[in-house]
């Protein structure tokens, strides 16, 4: 579950303050799908960056699966992001020199998954998307 309470994010540009998020509160239940829509500059990316632990709010509280993640260190944020958060960027890139299988396997290696399990997971993903020959 994601719970945001009074999340505010302000960017400073010279003497000006741009309030990208102003006291945002929301709850997203486990398994729930949410669409975030709005015009350019309305704070969508900032909100997703806070939820994805890629950015910090200036104030407010953020809970993920019941744990307060508001003030975690960078290393703790990276660990939680790796274990709990799935994030697909609008412009994402594969490693061009790697095969589809190697691109799928890379995060599993970083996660420390054993070779037999990696082979199994990579094969299942390739089959699911008909990518065996890529």
Model-derived features: positions:
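A short, flexible loop at the N-terminus of ABC-type nucleotide-binding domains that lies
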Residues: 1-4, 10-23
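The feature captures the beta-strand-to-loop junction immediately N-terminal to the Walker
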Residues: 37-39
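Short beta-strand immediately N-terminal to the Walker A/P-loop
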Residues: 34-35, 87
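Helix-to-loop junction immediately C-terminal to a conserved catalytic motif
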Residues: 52
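ATP-binding/catalytic-site motifs of ATP-hydrolyzing domains
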Residues: 61-63, 67
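Short coil-to-helix segment of the ABC ATPase nucleotide-binding domain corresponding to the Q-loop/switch region
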Residues: 98-107
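Conserved ABC ATPase "signature" region
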Residues: 67-68, 109-112, 116-134
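ABC ATPase NBD coupling module
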Residues: 15-18, 69-86
């Amino acid at each position: 579950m994601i719970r945001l309470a009074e999340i505010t994010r302000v960017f400073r540009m010279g003497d000006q303050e741009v309030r990208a998020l102003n006291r945002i509160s929301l709850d997203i239940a486990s398994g729930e799908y949410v669409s975030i829509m709005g015009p350019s500059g309305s704070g969508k990316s900032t909100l997703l960056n806070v939820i994805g632990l890629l950015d910090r709010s200036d104030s407010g509280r953020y809970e993920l699966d019941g744990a307060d993640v508001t003030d975690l260190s960078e290393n703790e944020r990276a660990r939680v992001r790796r274990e709990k958060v799935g994030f697909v960027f609008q412009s994402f890139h594969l490693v061009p020199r790697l095969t589809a299988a190697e691109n799928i396997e890379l995060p599993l290696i970083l996660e420390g998954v054993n070779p037999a399990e990696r082979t199994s997971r990579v094969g299942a993903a390739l089959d699911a998307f008909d990518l065996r020959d890529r």
